[in-house]
């Protein structure tokens, strides 16, 4: 409910969005005209066209080798005939016909071919055919249900989606009441309150209010940068305060739209770009577009490599824009000529090093490259001065630093190379913070085995494995806290002292604010002195002080008590909130920077190393998917067989989400290069 609530707030009229999406579940509509089915039809048509291309390529390849041609041509031509028939069926856009055609399609086996086991043509043809059969198998699964079964699912889905939407509406009303009582708003509220002042919803869209009309006369220009990252709500705000868009000046690059996870909609900017004609200074007809193709940051070789790669990869289908002459980068800077290349591609062979992870091997390779360039005094030109390269001139770019940066930091450190990562350590993941949070959790509720165990073995209390075995042997069936109490009654002083200390903290928690309680824990346990004796002790001490600061801010916000603070921290952990731990090295120091591509956007470094390029895409496989145009996609429950199953509606949504995700991944690569 919360996820859907957050998602629809990027739309200018969230309630209308819910009403519109529910209309997609009309079970009286012709199934072939259903919006989800249309998505599946389009996908299937493109998939079969791709199969035909693979098959035609195979037919062309075998023409050069007579024996392979004699063995394979007849079967491949038969495949082509089958695929053409399927393509014709798909063009009729009839669910039952397509479903039947896919169920009866049969591929015959290729004839046996002796003596060509390692021939690259043979291997490529076999692989192409495997790919074709896999695609057809996937299409058969997508269209496996009958029309009647689809309507049954549609009816069930309508009931569930309707209930979900009602829950979201109810949640919004209650949340708004709670916010009003506390006199607070969030960023989403500010957007929607602004929209309420500026526009009124009508049957055909919206109309400006008097306030908007008055404001639009006060601005000579409305200028917006990074417009490719706007959402529908923001776009409507900008349009409403402009003079019917005549004075609206927007700057953006669809190829650099990489914030889909924040509901950025590059298609908003793209529609403008496609609609407007090129600016003509002699006619001055508005709206118009100006192409800013000059690049003043990069050397010519980098731009050439970028243009070459993306002219092969980026299209309207994947990337959401055709990488044509208008989109190509033009060299605009002034750099001295140099002998070595501007771009190098390193291919790492991991076949002989399977014991180490790919991350570690890649990090080790990069560390050697940096060490070599530093050792050879590789020269760069910076601020019109030629000088030897330093550590601070290098930046390692990763798609995500959260999971992978640690390996790179470690390998660089082993080579004596100082580095800084934009995440370094997660605040909640540091040993000192994890220990104190576990202690707070058991002060709030001691019947929690995992945090209790973490506290017992921590430097604060120092229970050994033998101690724990003794405690657990006392009673294996009860929670650990009750086993501790039994052991204390048997005369175990260590257990008794621990329980007395926890009881004391529990009494303090009833009267003290959370920040004061944490300070009491530090003072009574001497934990601050303990962490200072550890490696990087000052950093650990800084983290403990940070925790008190977060607790103080929590109390100052109007919320009170330990229980609430623990819930607040748990939510931050669940949401993977970007809370950085203290770091001994600052971003501005002379160190190698390890950054996410998102973080590096807009920054400049003399030498960039783009790593982790072999990483697989992280496709969303959750039970519920959210699509800005198609709405939520959900799985259904088969109570009889106790299983979840997907539906044609969710399949359609997942296909389009995957396509958009691949487009965004391609744009992330573009930003990195």
Positions of the model-derived regions?
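Conserved motor-region signature of P-loop NTPase helicases/translocases
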Residues: 1-4, 12-23, 27-38, 42, ...
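Conserved ATP-driven helicase/translocase motor core recognized via long
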Residues: 2-185, 200, 406, 416-417, ...
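P-loop NTPase Walker
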Residues: 71-74, 81-84, 88, 92, ...
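Short glycine/proline-rich turn/loop motifs
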Residues: 144-155, 171-177, 181, 288, ...
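Conserved helicase/translocase P-loop NTPase motor core
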Residues: 164-220, 233-234, 365-384
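Flexible hinge/switch segments at interdomain interfaces of large molecular machines
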Residues: 169, 187-191, 283, 332-349, ...
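C-terminal accessory regions
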Residues: 460-462, 472, 588-591, 642-673
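Mobile, glycine-enriched helix-loop/loop "lid" segments at the mouths of ligand-binding/catalytic clefts
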Residues: 570, 618-649
